[in-house]
């Protein structure tokens, strides 16, 4: 059975209008497909704090035509110390940008989503659309919604995050908690940051924290602590956080003094990790956190979702002119197989608890900073499909992304 000639466009149904869903929709619309994005929330306002855009994610954003100039804050270094002030490592982000072709940016999530939605056709997004069921037959997929309506298409992409309904209905294994959680958010402190391009991470015996400039006077803060399913939220979360982290550094104390319980209202965010799923079924697949939720240890979640977009768009672009249902299924399985090894590598690294142990990380102080920088650069190279990315950029007539200030 033929699905539809590509010159007439595949009808793609995307469940979830976060960064993963909108980035994929941008790529598929660019390639001439007929895309509709369904979101259960009444609007697309992004919550949370900021995200780190590494070179691999920046390259995909460039391919999608997303203008990131002036968004957030580019970083020149990440300094890692212990809670007693001992220097462990400094990552040279400027050197990494030279080696990888794009700067590292800390960008508020709301700003990233705004940039993704620039020039995005509003009629392609349907809010207040809560999907409750999916099904697939030979040559067609269907999504059912809680208002009794349904919609049909040629393929379905689950981009609906950690608690993905689409993932549940594909029988993929559920996410498991790692035993840690983050209390996090953004704060505006004009008098705090001496160098707005330097991020700070501090590792202690029983927790860690980060203070990362996110553009203007905004600062992304997070405090990581152990977590379990029987966690009882304290009456004053900020009191607990201050008790754990006060005295770690002058900037930390300044942030702790500025925060209130209201700033912690949405926290904590427990860390989960999905087992990377096996092959999907038929014309249904997953991207982003719906596919591979991982702890924020390496700040790769958003970037890996963007790489999902790149590889999935490539898979569909390589379909024959009049693809059969089997052709489409093979393209989706190719996408899943191509991503699986690299996503699994990132997931394994993020699951390590080394970053939460001052004792384990003390030997890092004896390793030259240039080797820390080199190691992170090589890691990003290894998980980024750089050859494919370069070919796609050339095909789109894009020059290499070069580091920019700001």
Label the predicted regions.
Residues 180-212:
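Flavin-dependent oxidoreductases
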Residues 136-137, 212-216:
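Short beta-strand micro-motifs enriched in acidic
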Residues 143, 210-211, 220-221, 286-287:
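Short beta-strand motif preference
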Residues 44-46:
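N-terminal polybasic phosphate/anion-binding patch
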Residues 2-12, 29, 54-170, 174-186, ...:
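Conserved N-terminal helical subregion
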Residues 205, 214-217, 225-304:
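FAD/FMN-dependent oxidoreductases across multiple families
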Residues 15-42, 157-158, 183, 261-356:
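Conserved mid-domain beta->alpha element of the FAD-binding
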Residues 2-10, 298-299, 314-406:
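C-terminal helical "tail/cap" subdomain of flavin- and related membrane-associated enzymes
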């Amino acid at each position: 059975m033929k699905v539809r000639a590509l010159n007439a466009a595949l009808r793609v149904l995307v469940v979830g209008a976060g960064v993963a869903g909108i980035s994929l929709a941008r790529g598929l619309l660019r390639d001439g497909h007929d895309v509709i994005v369904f979101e259960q929330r009444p609007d697309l306002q992004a919550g949370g704090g900021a995200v780190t855009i590494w070179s691999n994610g920046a390259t995909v954003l460039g391919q999608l035509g997303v203008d990131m100039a002036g968004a957030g804050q580019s970083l020149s270094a990440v300094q890692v110390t212990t809670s007693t002030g001992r220097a462990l490592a400094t990552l040279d982000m400027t050197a990494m940008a030279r080696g990888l072709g794009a700067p590292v940016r800390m960008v508020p999530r709301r700003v990233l989503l705004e940039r993704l939605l620039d020039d995005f056709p509003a009629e392609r997004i349907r809010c207040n659309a809560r999907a409750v069921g999916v099904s697939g037959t030979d040559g067609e997929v269907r999504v059912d919604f809680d208002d009794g309506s349904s919609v049909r298409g040629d393929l379905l992409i689950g981009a609906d995050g950690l608690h993905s309904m689409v993932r549940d209905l594909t029988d993929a294994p559920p996410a498991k908690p790692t035993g840690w959680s983050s209390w996090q958010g953004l704060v505006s402190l004009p008098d705090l940051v001496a160098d707005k391009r330097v991020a700070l991470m501090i590792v202690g015996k029983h927790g860690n924290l980060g203070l990362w400039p996110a553009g203007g006077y905004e600062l992304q803060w997070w405090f990581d602590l152990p977590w379990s399913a029987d966690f009882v939220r304290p009456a004053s979360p900020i009191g607990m956080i201050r008790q754990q982290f006060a005295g770690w550094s002058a900037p930390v104390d300044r942030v702790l003094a500025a925060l209130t319980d209201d700033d912690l209202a949405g926290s904590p965010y427990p860390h989960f990790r999905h087992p990377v799923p096996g092959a999907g079924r038929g014309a249904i697949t997953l991207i982003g956190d719906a596919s591979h939720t991982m702890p924020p240890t390496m700040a790769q979640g958003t970037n890996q979702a963007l790489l999902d977009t790149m590889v999935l768009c490539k898979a569909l672009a390589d379909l024959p002119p009049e693809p059969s249902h089997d052709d489409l299924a093979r393209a989706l399985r190719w996408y899943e197989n191509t991503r699986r090894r690299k996503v699994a590598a990132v997931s394994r690294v993020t699951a390590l608890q080394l970053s939460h142990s001052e004792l384990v990380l003390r030997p890092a102080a004896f390793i030259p900073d240039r080797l820390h920088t080199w190691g992170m650069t090589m890691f990003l190279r290894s998980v980024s499909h750089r050859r494919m990315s370069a070919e796609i950029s050339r095909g789109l007539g894009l020059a290499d992304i070069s580091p920019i200030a700001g």
